[in-house]
Amino acid sequence: MIRIGDGRKSDSWAEINVVVDIFRSTTTIPMILFRGAKYILPFRDVRKAIEFKRRNPGTILVGEKYGIKPPYFDYDNSPAEIAEADLSGKVVAFTSTNGTYVLSRIRSGRIIFSSYVNLSATVAMIRSQRDVLILPSNRPIGKAPEDILFANLLKLMAEGHEVDVSEYTRKTEEINRNIIAGVGERDLEFCLRVDHTNIVPEYIDGRIVQSPDSVALTDA
């Protein structure tokens, strides 16, 4: 069974929990791994991420807080920016307003991250699972319609329904135009890019890595 919850309010979990934050965390996270990062360490607190880099100088800092790149960070929470970065073999410390908050709330089950950039790979991974919870990250002040829209798309596709993905990306683009200080054009283009990668990130033992299941999909 595939259910849709609320990343900020749900208090029960599934065997597989799918975090969705279209603008921009769950688009950026697959791109970090796609660009060669060894693994990602998620932080809710910017200061703790900076302190980690101070103790581990080779760390790359990526993220934002309330839409703004923090001081001392190497990259914004920007899939377009990350797409041009060489992260080969690097450890990335990552923080964001919504995605890492939702991650911190989940208490059981596997945790994976999905967006348009790894849509088909996510569908392939969850469609045969018996207990899946899709968690739109939403926002501190309320719902995020782009996350809810994608969650419904992911559910329909995983259940075997035929859908017009372009209609969902079109609606998502419209949503962005109505958001105050919405995503910039370069990031928007990346956030709407379908199946850019087969990588499905998974949170395992405190690190975000390429899911072993998505490795199998890539090799197939």
UniProtKB/Swiss-Prot annotation:
Its cofactor is Mg(2+). Pfam families: 2-ph_phosp. InterPro entries: ComB-like, ComB-like_sf. It catalyses: (2R)-O-phospho-3-sulfolactate + H2O = (2R)-3-sulfolactate + phosphate. Keywords: Hydrolase, Magnesium. The keyword Nucleotide-binding does not apply. It comes from the Archaea. Disulfide bonds: none annotated. Belongs to the ComB family. This is Probable 2-phosphosulfolactate phosphatase.
